[in-house]
Each structure stands twice: as C-alpha cells, then as structure tokens.
C-alpha cells in the first residue's frame, strides 16, 4: 500500500487562486488609454461578483492575489471577497516589475501595499509577484516581512 504525504489519506489537493489586478497594470503602463482602462473595470464590476457567486454555489474557497491599488480603488469588492471567507494575498501595489526596481523601491512597494491591506483589516499571509517576476531580493523580503508563503513557483513539493 502506498503512503500518501497528504493529510487524512488524500491523494492530491489544489489551490484555486485569482490575480485580481483590475486595471492596476494598465494605469502604470498606459494611464491615458481610456479604452484599456475600461477593460480593467470589468473585474470589479462584473467578474468578481460572478466569481464569488460561483464559488459560493460550489462551496469552494479561493485566494485573490490583489495589488494594493486595486484595494484602494475598489475597496467594496475587496471587502466582499473577505466577507465571503476567501483569502486575499499581496500582489504588489501598482503591478510593478520587481526585478526592474531598486531595493528601496521594492521595499516601498511592499509598504504601500501593506497600508492598503490595513484599510480593509487584512494581513495577507501569501505573496505573488506581479508578472511572476521577482528580484534577487524579493524572497528575502517576503520572509522578512512575515509572509507565510510565496506563490510564485509552480512545483508540488
């Protein structure tokens, strides 16, 4: 008989997660492109409510990795995610490319995002880098700042 390393004899598990970017990356890249900006507003106005209803119907909990800017702009939808029992994880502030900024700037991104999470009374346990692009110091910062896990790597180990 094969022994499972999963708890209670389970043979597998999964984690359902979403990157709730809204238009955070678009604001940074194309602040004057109103057509692009309108695409980013689909998430808080249409997608998130539908996803939350579907998850409720299926009795599934998920993680929403969310930039601080999204929390600041769409606070109500973020509070709704939390009120329905889902986890929110940190995802930068304005969807920054962490590998392309200085250590000081990266620390600033984490600090600004933390302030946004404080507004909705959430201390995120997980972190996922925007674009899954980390610097050579990101993981050290994640650990230093007290996150319990990092969600950038795609392995089952």
Give residue spans per PLM region.
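Catalytic alpha-helical scaffold of carbohydrate-active enzymes acting on polysaccharides/glycoconjugates
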Residues: 1-126, 131-157
């Amino acid at each position: 008989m094969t022994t499972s390393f999963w708890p209670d004899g389970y043979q597998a598990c999964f984690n359902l997660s979403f990157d709730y970017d809204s238009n955070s990356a678009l604001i940074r890249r194309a602040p004057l492109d109103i057509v692009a900006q309108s695409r980013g507003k689909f998430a808080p106005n249409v997608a998130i409510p539908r996803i939350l209803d579907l998850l409720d119907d299926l009795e599934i909990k998920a993680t929403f990795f969310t930039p601080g800017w999204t929390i600041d702009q769409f606070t109500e939808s973020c509070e709704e995610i939390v009120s329905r029992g889902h986890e929110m994880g940190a995802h930068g502030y304005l969807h920054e490319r962490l590998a392309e900024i200085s250590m000081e700037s990266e620390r600033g991104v984490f600090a600004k995002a933390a302030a946004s999470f404080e507004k909705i009374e959430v201390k995120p346990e997980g972190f996922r880098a925007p674009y899954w692009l980390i610097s050579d110091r990101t993981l050290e910062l994640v650990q230093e700042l007290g996150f319990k896990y990092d969600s950038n790597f795609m392995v089952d180990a």
